[in-house]
Design a protein with these regions (language model features):
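Alpha-helical propensity feature that highlights long, continuous alpha-helices across diverse contexts
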Residues: 2-98
Length: 98
């Protein structure tokens, strides 16, 4: 058996973020969607205020923007990807145990 996964971007009109496909012998066996919800401006402001200068610079670079809202979106996008990847690893680990 061959187990793998794919994480691909989702269209913005569907909520953005990522789509996870869990594959067994290249056939989809499951998966999920990991949207980005950065609509809470207060949460974004709290996040920005908690970042140190290095973190702010990093996320502004990742966003290719000088706007804190774009940095927050880049952060949320990275978090959604990490969640998708974590789910994929859990699935892969469960296949190895079977």
């Amino acid at each position: 058996m061959s187990y793998s996964y794919e994480i691909t971007p989702r269209p913005v009109e569907l909520g953005g973020g990522w789509r996870l496909r869990l594959l067994e012998n290249e056939e989809e066996m499951g998966g999920g969607v990991f949207p980005v919800d950065d609509s809470d401006a207060d949460a974004g402001m709290r996040w920005w205020n908690e970042c140190n200068e290095q973190e702010r610079a990093h996320w502004l670079t990742m966003a290719a923007s000088a706007r804190p809202a774009d940095a927050y979106h880049a952060f949320m996008l990275a978090e959604a990807y990490a969640d998708a990847e974590s789910t994929a690893y859990e699935w892969l680990d469960s296949r190895e145990e079977a």
